[in-house]
Amino acid sequence: MKKVKYLLFISMLILITNIPVSADNKEILKNKEALGNITFGVIIGGNNPEEEFMQIKDLGFSHCQLVVSEYSPELAKRLRESIVKYKVHPTTLICMGPGNYAWNFTQGPATIGLVPREFREARIKRLHEGIDFCKEVGIPAVHAHFGFIPENPKDSLYVEFIKIMKEIGKYALNRGIDVYFETGQETPITLLRAITDIGTGNLFINCDVANLVMYGKSNSLDGLKILSKYVKSIHAKDGKYPTNPYELGKEVPIPQGDVNFPAIVAYLKQIKFKGNITIEYELAEKNYEYIVKTKKYLEKLFLSTD
C-alpha cells in the first residue's frame, strides 16, 4: 500500500512539474528577471555618511552615487564603516571641479570638464585624488562631465583631450578603478569615438538620458542604443529639448519630459541590461517623496508585459 501511495505521489509530481508555462507567465518571469538585474540608487552627499546612508536605507535603496567635498582618510574610514553598517553600496564617486562650471551653450564649452585648457591641471589633480579615494573606500568607479568633446577628431582640443584621458584611464586602471563619462555635452557618436580612441579598457558611461535631450544631442533611446556597449549605469531624469539656442532644455519630473521611459526600459530589457539606475532630480535635491514615487514608476515599467 505504501508503495502504491509513493508511486501515485511521484506520478502527480511529474505531472505538476511538466505543466507547460503559458506565454503570459513566461513574460512575467522574464520581466521579474530583468528587474532583478537592476539596482536602484540616489545621489547623496558623502560628507555625513552615517546620516545620509541611514536615510536612503530607510527609503528602500541599497545603492548610491556620492558627492564629496574633501577626500580625507578620516572620511574614507567613516564611509567604509557606513557601507558595512547600512549595507548601502556607492556605485560611483562624482568627481568635479575645481573652478566654475557654466551649464549653458555659451560659456559651457569653455568651463566644463577637461576640454578647456584653463582648468585642466587642477582638475586632473582632483581626479587623481578622487581615484585614490575610490580605492581607499572601495568605490568601483569615478565619474564626471568631461566637457564638450569636439566633433572633429583632428581638432587640437580633441587630440589633447584624448591624450589627457589616456593618462587618467591608466592611472585609474593601475588602481583597479573604472572611469565613467556622464553623457550630455557631446553627441553619442563622438563619445563612442573618444572612448575607442582612448582605449584603456576601463572607460564606461553613466548615461543620463535626460541630458541627451536637454543638450539637444540625441533623442534618449537612439543615444542609449549607440552607447549601450559601454553603459554601466543610468541617470533616471527627465527634461525637454532646448528651444533657446543659448540655454539647455528644461529639467522636469519623470515622466513629464521628452525622455521616452517606456521605450528606454523596453530596450534595457531587450539587451538584458545589468547595472544601476540612479534617480536624479536636480530641481529638488532631497525630494524623497519624488524619488520613491519614481522608483515605483520604473519598477512598474520593468514588470509591464505591454
Task: Give residue ranges: language-model regions.
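Bacterial N-terminal signal peptides
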Residues: 8-17
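Conserved, mostly hydrophobic/aromatic
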Residues: 56, 64, 83, 134, ...
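Active-site acidic/histidine proton-transfer and metal-coordination neighborhood
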Residues: 104-204
